[in-house]
Amino acid sequence: MERQNLIEMEGVITESLPNAMFRVHLDNGFNVLAHISGKIRRNYIRILPGDRVKIELTPYDLTKGRITYRLRKR
């Protein structure tokens, strides 16, 4: 599967929803509905509201995304 045309952005988790879905407020001001990628799910990485994350968006639907990385707290 090609991942060349994905848009990668950063944001903050604002709300935790059922079925491992999250509402994310991106740095550019938009809100996105995102799910957890398989590697994060397999490694039991916990994502909570307030965490900064990296998100992949497809150019076809900019309202949904995939959480690929949880950034460390400073």
From Swiss-Prot:
Q: Where are the transmembrane segments?
A: none
PROSITE patterns, A to Z: S1_IF1_TYPE
Enumerate the InterPro entries for this protein.
NA-bd_OB-fold (IPR012340), RNA-binding_domain_S1_IF1 (IPR006196), S1_domain (IPR003029), TIF_IF1 (IPR004368)
GO CC entries: chloroplast; cytosol
Cite the entry's keywords alphabetically: Chloroplast, Initiation factor, Plastid, Protein biosynthesis, RNA-binding, rRNA-binding
Keyword RNA-binding present in the record's keywords: the answer is yes
From the Swiss-Prot or TrEMBL record, state where the protein is found: Plastid, Chloroplast
Protein biosynthesis: present as a keyword of the record? yes
A Gene Ontology molecular-function term?
Answer: translation initiation factor activity
- Predominant place of localization: plastid
Q: What residues does the S1-like domain cover?
A: 1-72
Name the CDD domains on file. Answer: S1_IF1
Q: How does it assemble?
A: Component of the 30S ribosomal translation pre-initiation complex which assembles on the 30S ribosome in the order IF-2 and IF-3, IF-1 and N-formylmethionyl-tRNA(fMet); mRNA recruitment can occur at any time during PIC assembly.
Q: Which PANTHER family match?
A: TRANSLATION INITIATION FACTOR IF-1, CHLOROPLASTIC
- Similarity remark: Belongs to the IF-1 family.
Its annotated function is as follows: One of the essential components for the initiation of protein synthesis. Stabilizes the binding of IF-2 and IF-3 on the 30S subunit to which N-formylmethionyl-tRNA(fMet) subsequently binds. Helps modulate mRNA selection, yielding the 30S pre-initiation complex (PIC). Upon addition of the 50S ribosomal subunit IF-1, IF-2 and IF-3 are released leaving the mature 70S translation initiation complex.
Q: What's the protein name?
A: Translation initiation factor IF-1, chloroplastic
